[in-house]
Each structure stands twice: as C-alpha cells, then as structure tokens.
C-alpha cells in the first residue's frame, strides 16, 4: 500500500476539499503520507526563530498605520479584499512603500507625489537590504531601547552582525541605491505606526525562512509591535486553531484502520526524487507505483520539474489526476477525473488577510460529470 502516494495541496482553499475525507480513505488503505512542506512551514519557522511565534498582526489593523511596507506581495491583485483597508489608511495620510523584484500592479498603484515609493531589489537580495536597514537604525540611535530591553534578547549580537552591512554594501548586492536604503530605514524607524505586510512569495524561494527571520528583527528593533497598526502582518493560518476546531472537520481519529502501523511520510518538495528512486527518495519501503493528484499542479509548482517529468514518464507508474483543467501534470495522467470549481461546492474557508471564517456556498450544481474532492473519495470508498 505504501507504493501509493496521495499528492495534494491547498486547491481552492476549502478545508473539506483539502483534508475532509482523503486522509481517512488513504489512511485505511495504508498509503504513504505526504508532508506538506512547500508552503507555510517556511514562513512560520523563520518568524518563530525571531519572535518565538509564527503569528503576526491582524492585517486589517494596517488601516491604522502611517507607513505601510508591502514586501514581496502583489496585494492589489492577489489580496484584493485587503486593498480597501490600505486605501483607507492612505486616505488618513499613510504612505505606501512597495518592495518587490517585479514591477507589479501594486507597484503601479503608488503615488510618489504623496511620498509613496517603489523599491525594486534584485531577486533574492531582500535580506541584504533588511540588514542594511538595521545597520542604519542602530547606527543612528533609532532603536526603541525600552522595548528592546524588555522584550528581546541578543541585541548586541545582532548589532555586531549588521555592523558591516552598510547601505553602500547592500546597494552592491541589491541594485538599490544606498540613499534609497538609507531613507527607507529612516522612514521605517521614525514614522509611527509602521506596518509590514508580506505573504508567501518569498518563502517559495531559496533562503525563504531566513527572509522572514530577518524581517522579524525590524519591528523588534523599533518597537513597532507596541502600537496598533505596527508590526508584521502575514497570512493568518497560524490563527486557524483559534478560529475553528479543524479536528472536528478532519476527524484524525478515523484515519487509521485498527492495528495498522503508521505509514511512512514523504516530503512533497522532493516529488522528483521520490518518483525517480527505487526506494522513494532514499526512504524505507517500496518505490511509488501509483500517484493520485488533486488540488495542485506539481509540475508547475514543485522544485525540479524536469525530474518530476522524468518520474511521471515511467511506464510502471499509474497516475490519476482530479482536475478542473488539463494542466501540465494532468497531461501525464493515465486517468483524468473532472473536478468541480469553488462555485460548485459547499465548504469552510479560512482567511488570508483577516480573522473571519468564511462559508463558501455552492452557487450552481456540479457541471456534467465533475465532482468535488469529498465526493470523489466518498465514491471511491463505496466502490
């Protein structure tokens, strides 16, 4: 049974669609389990190293900020329900700084005549800019010493670590002018409250955890956390256990048949290695001979796409994909099953930019032969 690998991710974000019935179905089968480590754990690990928690401020509190840094997030396009909150803050006089290696729709929304700014570091160099900002803040005595003394440890070590990261040095790495970095640091330390909004973009790249670990040091130095509208607002998945009892939906006690041992767990980020190794990427147990994919398109989203492609081309791999579209992954499937869209099924949805649970009510019946994820596994269990 461990030769079967269920492979899925967040899909349309519905909790039942993500983890409603599939763990029970594959758990009773004894199939390999999947460690969903490609999104979420990175940012949480990075912030916990600095803050001791993966949580941040409520994004809706950005309405009270006077300086908003949108760092690595195309908010106007991909987080549209938060944009009115940012616009409300701007009407109250807040300035907007967009930091992104790509000139996005959000970057185009800035207004330099009112003090907004677009800062465009080279890809993968954000950490150098953060270090230089901390260098300036400490050099110019702009730290909140009372906050640092009461709520942090390791200030001296951080001070020594950033001493060599001058704006000039960071400019050579990031491609951002030294004077821009200097002014950004001064603005961040002196305009209060200052809120940083970031999402999952950075964690999907090399050194993603270190991005968030370093970013977390900025509000700790300035004491931004002390004020409403100050701190870091990220995705709010870390609050999910406060919003809803997910175990009441997922029923983990129903996942294993009586007496069956716990199956092995495989890291979703290593799908290419798993599919091309006779022992599933060096783990104990058999190689993977059946791959069941839903809620994701790994050929487009998982590292080492060519290795995944090679694995999916194996003659001895049976692949089933439950999809709405003929994706890159679906093109390699032996069987493609039609999946419903978000508007065709009821579900419970947790938020990305606020602290309210959402109910997703179906607007139409499933089209033709398409079925929801929960219906798929219900039918398979009955078969």
Where are these regions (language model features)?
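Short glycine-cluster motifs
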Residues: 234, 242-243
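Cofactor-pocket helix-loop regions in the catalytic cores of large enzyme subunits
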Residues: 1-232, 255-383
